[in-house]
Amino acid sequence: MYKASSVRYEKMSYARCGDSGLMLPRVSLGLWHNFGDTADYGNMKELVFTAFDNGITHFDLANNYGPEPGSAERNFGKILREELGFYRDEILVSTKAGYEMWDGPYGNMGSRKYLLASLDQSLKRMGLDYVDIFYHHRPDPETPL
C-alpha cells in the first residue's frame, strides 16, 4: 500500500481558483495519452505517486481520454481506490466532456443531456461519488451558455 511523502507540500505553491475556495497546485498532472489501456499500469501508478509526493494534488482527466475513450478515468479510478483512497480529501479530480463518446445526436458537444450523462459515466468509471471540477471540454456553437 502506498504511503505519501510527509514533506509533499513543502515545495509546491498553490493558488486560489476563482471564488471556489479550491487551492490548485501551480502544476497539475494531465492524464490524456499516458493513462490509456495501452500504457503500462505500473508506470501509471509510479507517475501518480511521484506527482502526489511532490505536492501535485490536481489530476486532470476527460471522458474521452485513453486510448480507448474512458480508459484513463478507469485506470486512474483504480489507482485512487486501491492506493490513494486514504488521501482522497487531499486530491482534486477534474474531468471534462465535449468530444464524441457514443452514437446519435447526444453523443458529443454540449447539450445538457450529453454533459450530465457524461458526468454520470465518468463517476462510474472512476468509482467516485463526485469530482472536484467538471469542465466543458470545448465550445458548442449550437448550445448557448
Predicted regions and their residues:
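N-terminal binding-site loop/beta-alpha segment at the start of enzyme catalytic domains
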Residues: 1-91
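Glycine/proline-rich, positively charged
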Residues: 102-145
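Conserved beta-strand positions
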Residues: 29, 61, 95, 133-136
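Structural motif corresponding to the early beta-alpha repeats
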Residues: 86-110
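Generic beta-strand or strand-like secondary-structure segments
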Residues: 75-79, 92, 96, 114-121
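Feature marks short, surface-exposed loop/turn motifs that line or immediately flank catalytic pockets
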Residues: 33-35, 65, 99-101, 137-140
